[in-house]
């Protein structure tokens, strides 16, 4: 039989993999909120027109549709943690390439297309891992706790992005921090064990 909500929450809160998912998801929120809020100002500071920023955000939204769908499908075929690791590595690479390459409308569009494809692919994969590890009955409840970390990251991405810009008159350190968090999240997801959800009899034993 299935576990009760109390048993499921107790299992999750005492499980290393739940906390790896939770802490790792903070990086996702940081990156998405920082880019969505501060990228237009970053591009303007580097002499690019507002139309480049709006086009880039539109590209992110467009390619996100394909990325979210495909990562959801791929998560039924391959290990979700492995796909999630590749998402975070891809984001880090895209951010570092944006900083390294000469900034132009075309490099911005390329960055936006790649980042958009990787934008919300973490969501179906994270939900899938929670469901597989802890069972589907309370997956929404558990994802809510994990998503809280994402929203903390979102707050930090917006607030810290502005604070660091005011302190250093540049967004460079925020971009570097976003890439570093992405690499850290990849490391955190790598040891997650995707396994069958426990049942009440096993828990009682």
Regions found by a protein language model. Name each.
Residues 43-44, 74-75, 160-169:
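Interfacial helix-cap and linker-helix signal at transmembrane-aqueous boundaries
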Residues 130-139, 169:
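Paired intracellular helix-loop junctions of major facilitator superfamily
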């Amino acid at each position: 039989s299935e576990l009760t909500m109390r048993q499921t929450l107790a299992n999750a809160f005492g499980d290393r993999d739940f906390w790896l998912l939770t802490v790792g998801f903070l990086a996702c929120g940081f990156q998405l909120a920082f880019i969505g809020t501060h990228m237009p100002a970053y591009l303007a500071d580097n002499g690019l027109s507002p139309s480049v920023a709006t086009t880039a955000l539109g590209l992110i939204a467009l390619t996100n549709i394909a990325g979210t769908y495909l990562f959801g499908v791929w998560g039924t075929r391959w290990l979700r943690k492995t796909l999630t690791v590749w998402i975070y590595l891809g984001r880090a690479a895209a951010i570092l390439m944006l900083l390294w390459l000469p900034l132009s409308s075309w490099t911005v569009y390329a960055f936006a297309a790649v980042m958009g494809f990787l934008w919300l692919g973490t969501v179906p994969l994270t939900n899938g891992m929670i469901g597989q590890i802890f069972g589907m009955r309370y997956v929404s409840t558990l994802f809510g706790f994990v998503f809280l970390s994402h929203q903390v990251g979102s707050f930090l991405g917006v607030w810290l992005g502005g604070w660091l810009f005011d302190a250093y008159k540049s967004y460079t350190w925020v971009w570097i921090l976003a890439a570093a968090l992405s690499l850290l999240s990849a490391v955190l997801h790598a040891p997650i064990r995707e396994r069958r959800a426990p049942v009440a009899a096993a828990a009682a034993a």
